[in-house]
Amino acid sequence: MARNAEKAMTALARFRQAQLEEGKVKERRPFLASECTELPKAEKWRRQIIGEISKKVAQIQNAGLGEFRIRDLNDEINKLLREKGHWEVRIKELGGPDYGKVGPKMLDHEGKEVPGNRGYKYFGAAKDLPGVRELFEKEPLPPPRKTRAELMKAIDFEYYGYLDEDDGVIVPLEQEYEKRLRAELVEKWKAEREARLARGEKEEEEEEEEINIYAVTEEESDEEGSQEKAGEDGQQKFIAHVPVPSQQEIEEALVRRKKMELLQKYASETLQAQSEEAKRLLGY
């Protein structure tokens, strides 16, 4: 069974409506809302616009109308919404209610508005048109920024480069580079040597002789000999352990030194002599 909206669109229904309106003068809606000076008529034209919007919103739900028809319907709905806003402003000027605050906004909320697009809305199948769907897709949130404490948790020996040689890659490369660098230095030294020989220069003995870094000089042997003592048979005798004063002995020596400094500073010569005599008698 056909719906009421489809019945109203049939040819017979339109013909019957035309017969009923033959003897009547159809009043047309003013082009500008400011041309209307009566509040009841302004209310009438507003209701008429709402009815037209409702019909077009119902039509645009059909995705089989085609892209161009859907775009035209969406443009017409937005145009009627702007016109409805003009009539609401005019009604308020004529002393009527402020529909911008108290009026229903169901028709406005049926469409989605693209931010920054001057109030243009998309209704029904227009939301799924090519190029429109992407406008409503939300951008992914950026990853949360890590704090300094979280970054410090990920720092290990590898961050400081202590594990660079464990991967088995850098060591062969370093060996190859070292081998190549040594060969270059040897070739350079040979070239310089041949150039000096060609000029007739003699090489210095310091360059020919290798310095023995393990050789012990006489000065070093004298210093080391200060810790050695000769035995009865003339052989060297090494001291295995050098006595070191304990912490208590060091503290007692510091106390005695401090007492002597105080006596020299505050006591007279006679008192110091008496103190020394008393120590001698007591056997200190």
UniProtKB/Swiss-Prot annotation:
One of its GO terms (cellular component) is post-mRNA release spliceosomal complex. Keywords: Acetylation, mRNA processing, mRNA splicing, Nucleus, Phosphoprotein, Spliceosome. It is found in: Nucleus. The modification Phosphoserine is found at S246. GO terms for biological process: generation of catalytic spliceosome for second transesterification step; mRNA 3'-splice site recognition; mRNA splicing, via spliceosome. Signal peptide: none annotated. SUPFAM superfamilies: ISY1 domain-like. Belongs to the ISY1 family. Pfam families: Isy1. The gene is Isy1. Identified in the spliceosome C complex. Component of the XAB2 complex, a multimeric protein complex composed of XAB2, PRPF19, AQR, ZNF830, ISY1, and PPIE. Identified in a pentameric intron-binding (IB) complex composed of AQR, XAB2, ISY1, ZNF830 and PPIE that is incorporated into the spliceosome as a preassembled complex. The IB complex does not contain PRPF19. Interacts with CPSF3; this interaction is in an RNA independent manner. Interacts with the microprocessor complex subunits DGCR8 and DROSHA; this interaction is in an RNA dependent manner. This is Pre-mRNA-splicing factor ISY1 homolog. Its main location: nucleus.
